[in-house]
Amino acid sequence: MDNVVDRHVFYISDGTAITAEVLGHAVMSQFPVTISSITLPFVENESRARAVKDQIDAIYQQTGVRPLVFYSIVLPEIRAIILQSEGFCQDIVQALVAPLQQEMKLDPTPIAHRTHGLNPGNLNKYDARIAAIDYTLAHDDGISLRNLDQAQVILLGVSRCGKTPTSLYLAMQFGIRAANYPFIADDMDNLVLPTSLKPLQHKLFGLTIDPERLAAIREERRENSRYASLRQCRMEVAEVEALYRKNQIPCLNSTNYSVEEIATKILDIMGLNRRMY
């Protein structure tokens, strides 16, 4: 497709708009366009809905191109206002609900905030996720080696290879208690698996990264330092990868993967239960 154009994309919801964003991004990623995203959560009353409609219309007037609108709104009167806008509107939930309704012979009972809201039925799961986040923060970057037996996975790797963001994503998105342990330059002269980790080898997962990418990341943090030199990065990566092989620790090269992809691959390789919240 040759005609690549910029498009304004709205993600609108009477809740958090997370569902609209996730599904909308998935759809838009199929097209070679540069988008300008506008997320508008908690559109719960007619006054706010009219303000949103005016915002959509204003962009259409300025650009002459219809904004794309992905929405998830329960109240019909709010939906009606959004549908009066100059945007190309897509109800992302109803597109799936309608055929399911026909297949299951059941009428849906839509309730605002059901997907990401708190209710008596999901309070225990929510508390477990918060506990996982607290645990992960307390065990980031080898801060604490206490209660490591409570971790569901322990990520290993050199500095700046993606351990912390991956650990936090596992905790926040899936409620996984993820600890992580760094191997630093001082470890490299005699790199061995720490004694505290040996009994937990079944929970260990190694991250590695291309030295060139690692050097570029470190250069942003400590410019022109030994820490960021390509020679140092090559040495550290080689030593850590040798450690993984020696101890038969499953590992993944994070260079070309997003945090979401890394986390999902870890869940799959380690056989951890995938729980969505």
From Swiss-Prot:
Keywords: Kinase, Nucleotide-binding, Serine/threonine-protein kinase, Transferase. Its EC number is 2.7.11.33, 2.7.4.28. GO terms for molecular function: ADP binding; ATP binding; phosphotransferase activity, phosphate group as acceptor; protein serine/threonine kinase activity. It is an enzyme of class 2 (transferase). PANTHER family: PYRUVATE, PHOSPHATE DIKINASE REGULATORY PROTEIN 1, CHLOROPLASTIC. Bifunctional serine/threonine kinase and phosphorylase involved in the regulation of the phosphoenolpyruvate synthase (PEPS) by catalyzing its phosphorylation/dephosphorylation. Belongs to the pyruvate, phosphate/water dikinase regulatory protein family. PSRP subfamily. It catalyses: [pyruvate, water dikinase] + ADP = [pyruvate, water dikinase]-phosphate + AMP + H(+); [pyruvate, water dikinase]-phosphate + phosphate + H(+) = [pyruvate, water dikinase] + diphosphate. The keyword Nucleotide-binding applies. ADP binds at G157, V158, S159, R160, C161, G162, K163, T164. This is Putative phosphoenolpyruvate synthase regulatory protein. InterPro entries: Kinase-pyrophosphorylase, PSRP.
